[in-house]
Each structure stands twice: as structure tokens, then as C-alpha cells.
């Protein structure tokens, strides 16, 4: 655990403590670092700040994917906003996924819309992680202020672990190192890195993907782990390979990649490779020792492919956890029947895929429902459509735990009324909820 300056152990004691933890803590079973405890201590500074949300989130997520989840696996979906993430917590999900695709499209600090090609500003995903955690904190403050305690039936643990998209690291190993630190400072529980060339990175379901050599991808995973160790947080690291579809690579020098070279080169100087299952397996096996979960991006939802990939990874790294993108880029009914769709996540879990997520569900939910209401409102009978499509369904959802019907309270009006009352000595004539339409009409 991080130590304050006046409680700090000597360098030698810190090194010994780290070495003991790495050797004896089951958390690090099967994890390869490629650096020493002395390296971590030398480069982390004399004062080690604590990163409570990242620390807790990583520990919770690790326990969930190792048997403590409700379903035997964690299923999440990409949140497009902090408020949407809060609703996920209220509805009973156990983790939040934060998609770089969605951040690129509708949530980046560049304040514009991009495709998933690493065009947005480097700080965008950490900023969204921070924003989600700030909203979780406010929701928890509101709940706590009402006297609801952990263990109470109505208590909600808002601090869901957030798994964030680091794309291809936005550069080399130093970029990945700094990005990982930024993610941890923002409170991310898990972070994933992919093996594409950052300069021409594409969505996993686009064409034109270029792989970096296997060793370079491993070094980015080492960089991410090193950053987490320097920060003193057991962040969950997910390694993603795009080798199922990517048929280009930057170099021909890596022995792990040479079996897949075709001998052809492109006008940009890239080497052509044979994409598919075998190339994916070679990468997954190579990444497994440096990651906590391994993920192979695929073009269709294929249990057979998932099984072969899992078996190969587990033959080399027994028990290694796996992750799967249940992507909206798949035409699900074109590939599977209703029964197969219904059992798909359970079937994946049985193969060891313990963190599963729908990358773009949040933005599809948001944009689809916005369009549906806007179309009815623009072309129909005005307020009838708001009442029938939004307000009445919201009222009906209260029995499931939905509370945004009382939207003033949801965002903290009652909490700040309480703050005002305390400051003004126990009474106030300017409280926001007193005399509000919400108080009069929604209770």
C-alpha cells in the first residue's frame, strides 16, 4: 500500500515488501513483469499518493472476475456519459466499460465528433473516467445524506469499477506509461491496450489495421504494468489483439510474426501478413504473461473461434482470464439464432471469458431513443409523445428502482438544500425543493 512521507519505509524495506507481495500474493500468479522491485522503488518518488478509487475498483473487479460476480462473469456495456453510468449502477450492473469509440464520437475534450481512429485528444478517456467517478461520488453523497448505509436493502454501491480504453497507447511505450498513470489518477480499475500501430489505429471492425511487432505490443503491456506498480495500484490490464482481421504489420524482424509474413509489401512499406485464428493465437499466447485478461477482437460472434482461442491461450497460460467484445458491429441475428444469442454470454463464460461487454451499447441506446422521440415529436401530436414515450414509462420503471422521475433530487438538489440549511444554522427560506413542482406533483 502507498505510504505517506512520514511513515515511509526505507528503500530496502520497500523493495523487500514488493518482492514478497509479487512472490506470495495470488493476485500476481502467472504475471510476468520484466523489471525489478528496485526499478519500481527507484522511479516512484519519496511521496506515494493514494489512489483510492482506482485501488478499490481494481480489487473489486479482480474479485468479480474471479468468482464473486452474480452471473459467474461480469457483463458490462459502454457508458456514453456519467449519468448513464450512474443508471447502470442503479440497475444492478457490476462494472462500467468506457469505450474509446464512444469517446471519439461524442465525449472527447476536443469537443467534436471523430471516428474511432485515435484522432481525439489524449486526455479524453481519463477525463471521462474522472467525470464518471465524480458523478458516482455525488450519487453516493446523496444516498449517504439520506441515512442509507452499506448493508441496507436499498443501499447501492455506486463506485462501479471502470474498465477504460487506452487504444494503442497513443504512441510508444512512454506514451502508454503516462496514459496509464493518468487513467489511474482518474480512478480507472482496468485499462486495455491493443496491438495496432497507433499512428493509423482503426476500430477493430474497420479495414486498414496495421499491427506492431509482437514484442513491441508486449513492451506496451509491460509499460502499463510498470506504471501501475509505480502508482501502487493493482490495476487490471487487458491485452487486446486485432490479429484476426489485421493483415499488415510494420516490421518483419520479430520471430513470433515471421510465420505469418506473405512476402508482400505495401506502398507505405508495411508487410502483409496472413490474418486469422493462428495469428491471433500467437499473439494471445505471447501477451498472456503480461496481462490479467486477454481479448481477441473478432469480426463475427463465433463460439467456435472463441473456444479455439481460449484453449490455445490456456494451454500456454492455464487459468488465464479472457475478455470478449459482444459488439454492435456484429449483425447478431444474421450470425446466430435466438437461442444462441440468449446463451452466448453464458457459453463464453464457460470458456473462461469472465469480462464481457457491449462496447457501443450506450451510444446506440442514446442516439436511437433520441431519434425515436424526436421523430414522433416533430411529426406527431406534440406532448402526447413525451408523455407516452418518456414520462409514463419512467413512472412504471420506479418499481424496478428507477428514480430519475424525481430529476431535481437525482442530481443533488436535496443534498445542496441540506448544505444550505447547515450553513444557515438549521433553517433556510431559499431551499430549492421546498415549493418545487417536483415536491408537489411527483410524490
How should each PLM-predicted stretch be described?
Residues 1-6, 46-50:
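Charged, low-complexity surface segments at secondary-structure and domain boundaries
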Residues 2-29, 35, 391-443:
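N-terminal charge/polar-biased segments
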Residues 3-7, 20, 178, 350-353, ...:
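Alpha/beta catalytic cores of nucleotide-metabolism and tRNA/nucleoside-modifying enzymes
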Residues 21-71, 76-324, 328-330, 334-357, ...:
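Alpha/beta enzyme core
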Residues 339-428:
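Conserved alpha/beta catalytic core and glycan-binding cleft of carbohydrate-active enzymes
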